[in-house]
Design a protein with these regions (language model features):
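Phosphate-group recognition and catalysis centered on beta-loop-alpha active-site segments
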Residues: 1-148
Length: 148
C-alpha cells in the first residue's frame, strides 16, 4: 500500500465530525444538510461509510438503521436505492451515497472518510467496502483521506 502526505488543508481547517450536524436545525449527522452546512462554513468534513447490500458505499455511521431512522435492521441488508429512500429522523434528508456526498462537497473542503468495521468484531475485512470506496473516489479532485 502506498501512502501520500496528508494535504495541508486537513491541518488548516477545523474538521467537522459527521459533518456540521445540529439536530435542532434538522441537520442530522452525515446528512446532506450537514454536509452542505460544513461546506458553507468552510470546514473540513469527516464522514462514516457502511456498505449497502448491493455494494455501494453509503454515508452512515451505525451498522443498524434504528438510531437515526424509523427503520430497523442492518444497513448492509438493504440495497442503495432503498437506503436512499429512508428518511433520517428529524429531517427530510435520506441516507446518501458517497458519490452524492462527493458531488455536494465538490472539492471545496477536505474530506476525511472513516471506513467502518464490516465484521462487527474489529476483525479481518473482506475488502469490499474498501474496493467500492476506491472505485467511487476515482477521478475525485478534492482533498481526501481515509481511516479505519
Amino acid at each position: 500500500m502506498s501512502r501520500v502526505p496528508l494535504p495541508d488543508s486537513f491541518l488548516r481547517l477545523p474538521i467537522t465530525h459527521r459533518a456540521l450536524h445540529d439536530r435542532a436545525a434538522g441537520r442530522i449527522e452525515n446528512s446532506p444538510a450537514a454536509i452542505k452546512a460544513a461546506v458553507a462554513a468552510g470546514y473540513g468534513i469527516e464522514v462514516d461509510l457502511q456498505l449497502s447490500k448491493d455494494g455501494v458505499p453509503m454515508v452512515f455511521h451505525d451498522e443498524e438503521l434504528d438510531r437515526l431512522t424509523d427503520q430497523t435492521g442492518a444497513v448492509n441488508a438493504r440495497a442503495a436505492a432503498e437506503l436512499g429512500r429512508i428518511a433520517l429522523k428529524g429531517s427530510t434528508d435520506t441516507v446518501p451515497t458517497l458519490a452524492e456526498v462527493l458531488t455536494l462537497i465538490g472539492g471545496k473542503v477536505p474530506l476525511l472518510i472513516e471506513i467502518k468495521d464490516q465484521s462487527l468484531v474489529m476483525g479481518p475485512t473482506d475488502g469490499r467496502l474498501e474496493a467500492a470506496t476506491a472505485e467511487v473516489l476515482k477521478g475525485y479532485r478534492g482533498d481526501v483521506a481515509l481511516m479505519s
